[in-house]
From Swiss-Prot:
InterPro entries: eEF-1beta-like_sf (IPR036219), EF1B_bsu/dsu_GNE (IPR014038), Transl_elong_EF1B/ribsomal_bS6 (IPR014717), Transl_elong_EF1B_B_arc (IPR004542)
Any one GO molecular function term: translation elongation factor activity
HAMAP family xrefs: EF1_beta (MF_00043)
Protein name (record): Elongation factor 1-beta
Gene behind the chain: ef1b
Keyword Protein biosynthesis on entry: yes
Length: 91
């Protein structure tokens, strides 16, 4: 983890409130490219029973790292409505 100097927060919205979040979280973890790390995943209640997953993805401030790349990978996963990079910060 010491090689990483950025953290990007990516909010993933499931397609509906009935999606099994545990299964979705595991599927999403598997599509994160190897060069990135994962600090943690949080759940954020939105409305009407819908809960977003917030992935804290670790990367480097150098060419070849883009948190948008990870968000695009997330959007390809079944039961994902959207994935959006909320913030990127230095660590």
């Amino acid at each position: 983890m010491s090689d990483f100097n950025l953290v990007g927060v990516i909010r993933v919205m499931p397609t509906d409130p009935d999606v099994n979040l545990d299964e979705l979280e595991e599927k999403l973890k598997k599509v994160i490219p190897e060069k990135y790390g994962l600090a943690k995943v949080e759940r954020e209640p939105i409305a009407f029973g819908l809960v977003a997953l917030k992935f804290y993805v670790l990367g480097r401030d150098e060419e070849g790292y883009s948190f948008d790349e990870v968000a695009e990978k997330f959007e390809e996963v079944e039961n994902v409505e959207s994935a959006e990079v909320e913030t990127v910060s230095r660590i």
